[in-house]
């Protein structure tokens, strides 16, 4: 019926019917996410808002723009994907984010935060130029208002007065406890000159009254707070409505009708509860933001906890160990303290931890300034989000060679989050920047040594990367050794061909080495370690080998093999080099092993490729 694609069947006058739809949507979201994993609490909290949007607007004439879009599950269910929703985040299944190639109802690709208003402004401009009917409608979370791009877009929107509706989904939480959340932002407005001046004048008047009525002053202050949230937006030229109950369909429908009639920029402030409808998740924000498969009755994870430390945990433990001895160490993150492991530093040394909210550029620039003042900032950040701060890395850190330390988490193929979250670009863009030192560990033990090296390196910015979940190389296969600037490590010398691994690529190369040994082909194995600077002895190291095969989980263009080939060219060395890096395409979502197999990067495919290159068959 309604849920099979007929969004126009949602009757805005039938509130009881819409409430039943909301219940059905929540049941389906819980059913699928408990089986597949996904972004649960945000999607449950936004159900009524999305149903209200679909009840009043045709989303093909009035584009729906979901900020980040992890909260858009209800939208997917209402637009022909109710049955296929069971494939959510699965290989070749539905994406966990909006994706135009998946559905015509998904207007714009999303995955990173705070872009929705900027996209909406662009749509509104185009509609004005084309004299098209309709207006863009953006649904954004309170965490997204900490990013600069939001204010850049708001600045133009308020000036140009383009027709646009923004729904601010205020659940007092982005990904972690409310750094940059609306409640905190609005409390700052109360400290501003408008509020302070107005309040002081009224208090002055009230102070002349008898003491028996002085209670009016405090009552006034509380009343005035109710109008404060809209002041900021109204001053920018944006109509403000709210706050409203984001789970009250009657209020949502009536407010959207009003906003539609204004034909001007409007911000609707809707207050919602993350995890709404699933008691176990309500009020437990961070735990239920992004989840793996879980038991619906108990809320317990279906996956047993690994006894092996994740790379994030290995990094976090080592940083905490160093921070106990070195007071100059500070931790910086952009709204991801738990995901990057810095939550341990928060607990131990809260004054030396800085969550700058969703503001990656600010994270890098402010860290550069701290480095100039003699501190050792470890900027802990996902590879996919680091690209948002590229100019700050170049302009503020590298030109002045300030020793910030970039701890790049989720490097490589990350799995179910797909194109918008793969960590495949950092190698190519970082190695092109002068003064940047770049290296990568092969396992948890060498990751610990990488953190120690970064802490001691004080002559330039440095960056080290590590994967999500676990390294491909099992612990204890090779003895860990310390990092020496620009030095590689030859792990196995014997063989006619040389397998070169960088970072997590060492584990992949080692598995291929073992597979080839079963074919009576001996391979040497080199842990490149430093991509920049490369080992100055590299020409001597590779001299005995007929062919070189390079393994690394990053894009081939500008990647590790490119760096090696550039080095060989400068040395006038001719040597066959074959790259097993990622081809020039965006990589879809799905189980990491299945994605790697589809790319020919599993052990069997890699072994076959080398056998073919050597003129042998399996």
UniProtKB/Swiss-Prot annotation:
Molecular function via GO: 1-deoxy-D-xylulose-5-phosphate synthase activity; magnesium ion binding; thiamine pyrophosphate binding
Record's keyword terms, sorted: Isoprene biosynthesis, Magnesium, Metal-binding, Thiamine biosynthesis, Thiamine pyrophosphate, Transferase
One annotated GO biological process: thiamine biosynthetic process
Pathway: Metabolic intermediate biosynthesis; 1-deoxy-D-xylulose 5-phosphate biosynthesis; 1-deoxy-D-xylulose 5-phosphate from D-glyceraldehyde 3-phosphate and pyruvate: step 1/1
UniProt-listed CDD domains: TPP_DXS, TPP_PYR_DXS_TK_like
A GO term from the CC aspect: cytosol
Keyword check for ATP-binding: no
Domain of life: Bacteria
Keyword Magnesium tagged: yes
Coiled coil regions, renumbered to chain: none
Needed co-factor(s): Mg(2+); thiamine diphosphate
Biological role: Catalyzes the acyloin condensation reaction between C atoms 2 and 3 of pyruvate and glyceraldehyde 3-phosphate to yield 1-deoxy-D-xylulose-5-phosphate (DXP).
Subunit record text: Homodimer.
Database matches in HAMAP family: DXP_synth (MF_00315)
NCBIfam families cross-referenced by the UniProt entry: dxs (TIGR00204), PRK05444.2-2 (NF003933)
Protein's UniProt name: 1-deoxy-D-xylulose-5-phosphate synthase
Species assigned in the record: Helicobacter pylori (strain HPAG1)
Organism phylogeny: Bacteria, Pseudomonadati, Campylobacterota, Epsilonproteobacteria, Campylobacterales
GN (gene name): dxs
């Amino acid at each position: 019926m309604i849920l099979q694609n007929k969004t126009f069947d949602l009757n805005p006058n039938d509130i009881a019917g819409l409430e039943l739809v909301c219940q059905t949507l929540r049941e389906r979201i819980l059913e699928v996410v408990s089986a597949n994993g996904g972004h649960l609490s945000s999607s449950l909290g936004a159900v009524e808002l999305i149903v209200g949007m679909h009840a009043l607007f045709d989303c093909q004439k009035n584009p729906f723009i979901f900020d980040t879009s992890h909260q858009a599950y209800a939208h997917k269910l209402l637009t022909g994907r109710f049955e296929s929703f069971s494939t959510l985040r699965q290989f070749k299944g539905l994406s966990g984010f909006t994706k135009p190639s998946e559905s015509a109802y998904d207007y714009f690709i999303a995955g990173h935060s705070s872009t929705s208003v900027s996209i909406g402004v662009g749509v509104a401009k185009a509609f004005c130029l084309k004299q098209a009917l309709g207006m863009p409608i953006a649904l954004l979370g309170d965490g997204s208002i900490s990013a600069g791009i939001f204010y850049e877009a708001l600045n133009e929107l308020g000036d140009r007065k383009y027709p646009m509706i923004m729904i601010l989904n205020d659940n007092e939480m982005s990904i972690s406890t409310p750094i940059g959340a609306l409640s905190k932002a609005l409390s700052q407005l109360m400290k501003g000159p408008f509020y302070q001046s107005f309040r002081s004048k009224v208090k002055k008047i009230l102070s002349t009254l008898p003491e028996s009525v002085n209670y009016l002053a405090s009552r006034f202050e509380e009343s005035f707070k109710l109008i404060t949230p809209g002041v900021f937006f109204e001053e920018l030229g944006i109509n403000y409505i709210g706050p409203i109950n984001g789970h009250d369909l009657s209020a949502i429908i009536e407010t959207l009708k009003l906003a539609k009639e204004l034909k001007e920029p409007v911000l609707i402030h809707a207050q919602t509860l993350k995890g709404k409808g699933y008691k176990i998740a309500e009020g437990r924000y961070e735990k239920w933001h992004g989840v793996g498969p879980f038991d619906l009755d108990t809320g317990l994870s279906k996956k047993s906890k690994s006894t092996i430390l994740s790379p994030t945990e290995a990094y976090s433990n080592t940083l905490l160990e160093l921070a106990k001895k070195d007071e100059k160490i500070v931790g910086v993150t952009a709204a991801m303290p738990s995901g990057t492991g810095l939550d341990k530093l928060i607990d131990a040394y809260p004054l030396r931890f800085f969550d700058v909210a969703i503001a990656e550029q600010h994270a890098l620039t402010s860290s550069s300034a701290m480095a100039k003042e003699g501190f050792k900032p470890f900027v802990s950040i996902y590879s996919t989000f680091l690209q948002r701060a590229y100019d700050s890395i170049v302009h503020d850190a590298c030109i002045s060679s300030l020793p910030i330390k970039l701890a790049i988490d989720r490097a490589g193929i990350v799995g179910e989050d797909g194109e918008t979250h793969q960590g495949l670009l950092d190698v190519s863009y970082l190695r092109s920047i002068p003064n940047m030192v770049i290296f990568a560990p092969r396992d948890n033990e060498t990751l610990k040594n990488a953190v120690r090296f970064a802490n001691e390196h004080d002559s330039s910015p440095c960056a080290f990367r590590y994967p999500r979940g676990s390294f491909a190389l099992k612990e204890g296969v090779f003895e860990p050794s310390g990092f020496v600037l620009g030095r590689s490590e030859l792990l196995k010398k014997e063989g006619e061909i040389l397998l070169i691994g960088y970072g997590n690529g060492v584990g992949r190369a080692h598995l291929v080495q073992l597979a080839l040994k079963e074919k009576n082909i001996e391979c040497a194995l080199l842990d490149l370690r430093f991509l920049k600077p490369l080992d100055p002895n590299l020409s001597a190291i590779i001299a005995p080998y007929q062919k070189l095969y390079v393994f690394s989980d990053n894009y081939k263009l500008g990647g590790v093999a490119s760096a090696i080939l550039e080095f060989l060219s400068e040395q006038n060395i001719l040597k066959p080099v074959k790259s097993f890096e990622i081809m020039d395409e965006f990589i879809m979502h799905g189980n990491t092993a299945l994605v790697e197999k589809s790319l020919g990067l599993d052990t069997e495919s890699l072994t076959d490729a080398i056998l073919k290159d050597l003129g042998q068959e399996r």
